[in-house]
């Protein structure tokens, strides 16, 4: 997981947010 990844956060916010 990472800021520029859409693993967990990317599902909710986007690929980089």
Swiss-Prot record:
Keyword field contains Transcription regulation: no
Record GO cellular component, one term: extracellular region
Tissue and organ distribution: Expressed in abdominal perisympathetic organs and abdominal ganglia.
Main location: secreted
GO terms under biological process: neuropeptide signaling pathway
Keyword Secreted: yes
Record key words, sorted: Amidation, Neuropeptide, Secreted
Residue list for modification Leucine amide: 17
UniProt-listed InterPro entries: Pyrokinin_CS (IPR001484)
Subcellular location: Secreted
Origin: domain of life: Eukaryota
Gene Ontology MF terms: neuropeptide hormone activity
Purpose of the protein: Myoactive.
Record family assignment: Belongs to the pyrokinin family.
Protein name: Pyrokinin-5a
């Amino acid at each position: 997981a990472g800021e520029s990844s859409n693993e967990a956060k990317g599902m909710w916010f986007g690929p980089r947010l």
